[in-house]
């Protein structure tokens, strides 16, 4: 007897994510286990979509600082002060748990300059004794690296070639305008998602 249930195509899930953090690393090539190197995360934002770009979930958490204060330059850039983070923030562990739960259901992880954010979150997972390898093993796409030729912004390097485009530069190239709220992780990731699907339509990612 023929089954009355037709096979349904299960939609792939994509997770787009971005972080804001307390300063910059000394060494961008350091392992995620080099806890002295990678700055502390102060905001984590992510969007889960299906493969057509329909948003299934949007989340943004300010992280409550434990054992550090947010430096002034970062507070000015992100508008996240130590005081605000202590009032509005949630614990690092609860933010990471929720993010990793959503990540476990995703087929692909996307970010702009994704290796930086993978290292920031990976190091925080390591600090918390959580499974950072699960994050690093997930298939990922970097909209910065994949759009370098498309943006064709000349590099200042003596070797020539193109420089890696900032998210604002990619957004301007695709849509003719910049976006509001740069240096807020949620605004950045909303722009990254928009850019990713526009690049996908053009066959660039």
Please describe what each predicted stretch is.
Residues 19-27, 32:
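Short acidic, Gly/Ser-rich segments with clustered Asp/Glu that frequently serve as metal-coordination loops
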């Amino acid at each position: 007897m023929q089954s009355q249930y037709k096979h349904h195509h299960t939609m792939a899930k994509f997770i787009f994510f971005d972080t804001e953090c307390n300063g910059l690393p000394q060494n961008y090539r350091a392992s995620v286990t080099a806890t002295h190197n990678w700055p502390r995360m102060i905001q984590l934002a992510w969007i889960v979509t299906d493969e057509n770009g329909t948003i299934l979930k949007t989340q943004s958490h300010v992280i409550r600082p434990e054992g550090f204060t947010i430096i002034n330059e970062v507070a000015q850039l992100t508008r996240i002060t130590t005081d605000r983070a202590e009032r509005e923030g949630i614990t690092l562990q609860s933010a990471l748990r929720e993010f990793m739960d959503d990540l476990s259901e995703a087929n692909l992880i996307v970010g702009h300059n994704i290796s930086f954010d993978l290292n920031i979150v990976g190091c925080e997972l390591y600090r918390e004794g959580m499974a950072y390898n699960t994050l690093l093993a997930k298939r990922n796409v970097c909209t910065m690296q994949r759009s370098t030729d498309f943006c064709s912004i000349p590099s200042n390097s003596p070797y020539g070639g193109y420089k890696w485009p900032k998210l604002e530069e990619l957004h301007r190239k695709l849509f003719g305008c910049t976006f509001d709220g740069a240096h807020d992780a949620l605004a950045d990731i909303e722009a990254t998602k928009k850019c990713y699907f526009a690049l996908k339509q053009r066959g660039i990612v």
